Each structure stands twice: as C-alpha cells, then as structure tokens.
Amino acid sequence: MSKSKCSVGPMSSVVAPAKESNAVGPREVELILVKEQNGVQLTNSTLINPPQTPVEAQERETWSKKIDFLLSVIGFAVDLANVWRFPYLCYKNGGGAFLVPYLLFMVIAGMPLFYMELALGQFNREGAAGVWKICPVLKGVGFTVILISFYVGFFYNVIIAWALHYFFSSFTMDLPWIHCNNTWNSPNCSDAHASNSSDGLGLNDTFGTTPAAEYFERGVLHLHQSRGIDDLGPPRWQLTACLVLVIVLLYFSLWKGVKTSGKVVWITATMPYVVLTALLLRGVTLPGAMDGIRAYLSVDFYRLCEASVWIDAATQVCFSLGVGFGVLIAFSSYNKFTNNCYRDAIITTSINSLTSFSSGFVVFSFLGYMAQKHNVPIRDVATDGPGLIFIIYPEAIATLPLSSAWAAVFFLMLLTLGIDSAMGGMESVITGLVDEFQLLHRHRELFTLGIVLATFLLSLFCVTNGGIYVFTLLDHFAAGTSILFGVLIEAIGVAWFYGVQQFSDDIKQMTGQRPNLYWRLCWKLVSPCFLLYVVVVSIVTFRPPHYGAYIFPDWANALGWIIATSSMAMVPIYATYKFCSLPGSFREKLAYAITPEKDHQLVDRGEVRQFTLRHWLLL
C-alpha cells in the first residue's frame, strides 16, 4: 500500500494526522480531500497512518525536555556492569585486542538494534507490547521482554540495597570491613591475608578470610548461617530496611511517569561521571596504579584466535546496551514524533562504550594498587561481579586517607548507577502494560505501586541468610538466553515480517531522512545472524550456576529453566492464541496475523504484501 495514496470506497472518510510542524504544540490534523467518481481519496504524501487514534495520540505525555530523555537512556544503559564486567573482560581477553571484536559487534549489531528500538517506540508511541500492532502474531515478544524486566527487578534492586547498606556503614570513624574484631568475623579472619586464587576472588572460602570478604559474606549477607538454597532463613532486617528505601525511591521516581523520572535522572545519570572522574584522579596517584593500567591495556592479538574472546565480546555488546528489555521502546514512546532518534542512538551508544572503557582505568588503577599492596600478580586480584565492588574495591578504599569519605562517595555512585537502571526496568513493565490495558492507564499511580510492591515481596527471598543463592540463580537464568531470544524475534519481526522498507519509511516520516543502505543491511541480515549466533552459543556453552564452591541442586537448576522458559514461552503462546482467535480460513488467519493492523483493510481486499516475494527481498 502506497503511503502517498490511500483509496477508500464510497460513503467512507479518512482522518490522518499530518506530520508535526511544531514539536511543542498539539499535532495538527489536515484533511486533503479530492472528490472522485468512486468516493473520497487522500492525496498528501506527507500524511501519516497514525499508530493509534488521534485521542490516544493527544493524551500521550512527552518528556519535558529532550535532555530528560537522553539522560534516562544513558542512565539505564550505563549501569553496574559497565564498572564490574567490561574492564575485567577486556583484561581477560587480550587487553586492547578485545576492543577489536567489541567495537566490530557494536557497530554491526549493537548500534543498529539500539536505533531500531528507539525508532520502533517513537513511531508507534506505545510500550513493548503495543508496538507489535506492526505484526500482531508476534505480540508475545512484547510480553516476553516485559516479563524479563519484571524478573530482573527481583534481584537487581537487591544490589542497590547492598550498596545502600554499605553507604550507611561508611559513616563511621573506622570502616567495618578493615578489622577482624567484629562480631561477625570468624577465627580464620586475617588482616594480612592475600589470596592467590583468581577463581571467584572474594567469593570463595580462600579469600573469605579477609575482613572485607567476611564483612560482605558474614556481616551483610549472613551467608554462614545458611547451608544452601534449601535453607534460606528469615530476611535480614537491615537489608530489608534498605530494600524498603530503594522501593520507596523507585515508586516516587515513577508514579507520575516521565515527568518525575525525567527529573530524577539529572542526578542519577550525571553523578557517576563526577565520582568516576574523582576516583580516577585519586587512583592514578596510588603506588602500583600504572602496573594495573598497563595490564588493562596490554595488547595480545593472538587471543583473537580464540572463540571465547569473540563470544565474550558479542554477549557484552548485547547486555551492555540494554536492548531487549523494552526500556528503550518505552522511553522513546514518550518522544515527540519528529525527534531525531538516529542522532540519539549514535550519541547514547557512544557514551555507553566510552564509559565502559574509561571505567577500566578507574578499576585497574586500584587493582594495581591492591596487587602491589598484597605483593601478588594483577591476575590474582582481577575479578568481576559483586566481588569487585563489594570486596576488592572497598578494601582498597579502606587503605586511603579519608577512607570513610571515599567509601561514601563510591557507594553513592553505585546507588545512582543502580537506581536509574532499575527505574528503566520498572518503566518498561509499567508502560508496556498500561498502554495495553486501558483500565491500568486510568489508575497508573496505583498500578505502579502494585508493581514495586510485587518486586519488593519477591526480592525478600534475596535478603535472607541464603539470599545470595537465590540472587545467583535469578541472575543466571532470568535474563540470559531468554533476553537474547527476545531480541532475535524482535529483529526478525521488524526487519522481515514488517519489512525494512516499511520501517525505513516510518523513520523518514519522523526524521525526514530515510536510513541508508548500511542500516537497512544490518537490520535485515547482519543483526539477525549475529543474534542467532549468540543465542546458539549461549545454549551450547551453558554451564549450571554456582556460588564459589557451592553447587546448586538439580531442582534449583530446573526452577531456573522454568523461569527462563516462562518468558520465552510468551511468543508461541500468544501466537497460537492470536491465530486461533482470528476469523476466516487458514490463509486469511495468517494474513491478518502477519499484516500490520493499519493495513487489515488491504487483507479484506486480498492485497497482502507479506505474501509476495518482493516484500521479503526488499531492502
């Protein structure tokens, strides 16, 4: 169906909102009617087939300022993993050589997918489920990413609660993780201990004899009071109180929509950069810092011959940008229709990558200092995950002058890094469901309260004595293969079923420029192939989770797979439901299922472009 010419039968009328001429004012609606013998015809090539009714379009709130949107996207994408995962992967996989596959995958897959989600949400002006009016049969992928974001909230908020606990603990003359004379310490605690094991440094029994490790595992988590995931014990009141504060902060950041969250990110998205700069300036002055930075940047191009390096780069690109959680779709749905989403995608992905790379200097300057302090190689103190930011880094900070102040600043940075990412995940769930169910839309504040309370109640399992085992299980299964699967189906749905040509036309209507051949090739071929590769690799290389020396029982692994498959199952379940609920023959059902809702009148006339070879070959 041509966008410049839409014929309708006698006694029909067409109402189409014209392209916005003023981004600030309400959308003007223009009707250009040409009387013909056969009825009424719309003849303006700039008119838009609206993604929703004009009333819905007018009621859609928008960001107060463009910078609110950019800070929200940056705050969501730049999270704790930028600090604790990328620098370690870079060091482990050949230093500077790791940047080759990382930047390659970022350019051919990461940026195109990021751009695709921003454009998808902005054009359709709905959340992760509602945008699938472009291909109704795949609406289940919207519920997949919403459910994944909901699952992630169960354990991600706990990391923020840990950081808040450490933040409060920093307001003491002597930091509680520098001595072995506390009530939680074991007889094996030794101030002078240095680990010679890099396997899970800080999270195993060997390194667990340092004061910093014992404070995290015994003083905060009370892990010594649990025998495993089948012996959780009661929630710890200190962590529960911190979790309550996190939930309260999240609720009042989200209850009024982007009008409130857009103001919160002015602090949460910018403060980490101030603190990282201060830590870098302090870190490079420490003895051994240059050794750590040299280890971080050392180039070993022979490592590029190893498949594991490319796998690590591919998975890091997928997870670091935050595609597939529905957050980018939700955020961009509140943009003005004519916003330049292409420029936004380039800016935010570039900032994300630069932040990951620069944080490595901060991390490894302190790791070099710790290696010299303990007289061990860098590899014996280099680690990723919670062990880095809750054991290694606090121990290093504790040796500095004004250690309490540095500790408070560091954990305040972790709080802000976590809060805006958690806000993004919650907004994905709220926007996705509120846009789908009008009853929830009328009671958004109450629904937001219900969502944050639900995540709080389920997060309580993670703040028990054995809560770290629940945390590890959720971290391993909730957003692993399932999120990659969701992004793969999303990419196929947009580029193949909806069509790259149609998608490019949509972007041209918004920005005035059609994406060039490079982006269309990436959407059509490169990104789906890349995602298929990553999904297959994640399944083939799957290893059951473990925490230090603790091996999870079979029933726990089975529960983990139930969590993972429950979100992925939304795709076939909804597709089956949609197909069976449509009227007509098998061919008519299929036509309605894969044709955008706005083009269903064409299906009535037997014009189904998805049934033509040309549709599948066009770029």
Curated annotation (Swiss-Prot):
- TM segments? 57-95, 96-127, 128-171, 236-255, 256-286, 306-334, 335-375, 400-441, 442-465, 466-498, 516-541, 553-582
Name recorded for this polypeptide:
Sodium-dependent dopamine transporter
How this chain assembles, per its entry, is: Monomer. Homooligomer; disulfide-linked. Interacts with PRKCABP and TGFB1I1. Interacts (via N-terminus) with SYNGR3 (via N-terminus). Interacts with SLC18A2. Interacts with TOR1A (ATP-bound); TOR1A regulates SLC6A3 subcellular location. Interacts with alpha-synuclein/SNCA. Interacts with SEPTIN4.
UniProt binding sites for Na(+) 2: 77, 79, 82, 320, 352
* Source species: Rattus norvegicus
What cellular-component terms does GO give this entry? Answer: axon; axon terminus; cell surface; dopaminergic synapse; flotillin complex; membrane raft; neuron projection; neuronal cell body
Stored Pfam families:
SNF
The observed outcome of changing residue 79 to A/G/E is: Significant loss of dopamine transport activity
What keywords are annotated for this sequence in UniProt? Cell membrane, Cell projection, Disulfide bond, Glycoprotein, Membrane, Metal-binding, Neurotransmitter transport, Sodium, Symport, Transmembrane, Transmembrane helix, Transport
Name the InterPro entries for this protein. Answer: Na/ntran_symport (IPR000175), Na/ntran_symport_dopamine (IPR002436), SNS_sf (IPR037272)
Q: Which GO terms describe its biological process?
A: adenohypophysis development; amino acid transport; cognition; dopamine biosynthetic process; dopamine catabolic process; dopamine transport; dopamine uptake; hyaloid vascular plexus regression
Binding, dopamine: 79, 149, 153, 319, 421-422
Tissue expression per record: Brain. Expressed in the substantia nigra and ventral tegmental area, regions that contain dopaminergic cell bodies.
Remarks, miscellaneous: This protein is the target of psychomotor stimulants such as amphetamines or cocaine.
Q: Where is this chain's protein located in or outside the cell?
A: Cell membrane; Cell projection, Neuron projection; Cell projection, Axon
Q: What is the recorded function of this protein according to its Swiss-Prot or TrEMBL entry?
A: Mediates sodium- and chloride-dependent transport of dopamine. Also mediates sodium- and chloride-dependent transport of norepinephrine (also known as noradrenaline). Regulator of light-dependent retinal hyaloid vessel regression, downstream of OPN5 signaling.
Its lineage reads: Eukaryota, Metazoa, Chordata, Craniata, Vertebrata
Q: Does the keyword Cell membrane apply?
A: yes
